[in-house]
């Protein structure tokens, strides 16, 4: 599902989602269900963003930027995959929107 960030629509081809097991509270279910979400955004491969926006996004991403040039967000605060996916997508959209603002 594409992610809307301001006036941009980030296509699925620039995103990948993996579901992983989440630790912490949640009862026995937490050890059986992969409810945490890893959302990866291919920043370097994204054709929608110009180089200035990419540079700002690299700065904003900080340690969430991988060596391959992808932004990696992990959401594990909720008990369901769907809620964690929405959280990760909202955080990515907020990062991109912040990078779109020229200083």
How would you name each of these model-derived features?
Residues 1-103:
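Ribosome-associated translation termination/rescue signal centered on the conserved GGQ peptidyl-tRNA hydrolysis loop
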């Amino acid at each position: 599902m594409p992610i809307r960030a301001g006036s941009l629509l980030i296509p699925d081809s620039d995103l990948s989602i993996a579901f992983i097991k989440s630790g912490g509270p949640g009862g026995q279910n937490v050890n059986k269900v992969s409810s945490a979400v890893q959302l990866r955004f291919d920043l370097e491969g994204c054709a929608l963003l110009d180089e200035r926006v990419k540079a700002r996004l690299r700065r904003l991403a900080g340690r969430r930027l991988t060596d391959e040039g992808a932004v990696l967000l992990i959401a594990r605060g909720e008990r369901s995959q769907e809620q964690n996916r929405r959280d990760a997508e909202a955080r990515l959209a907020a990062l991109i929107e912040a990078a779109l603002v020229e200083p």
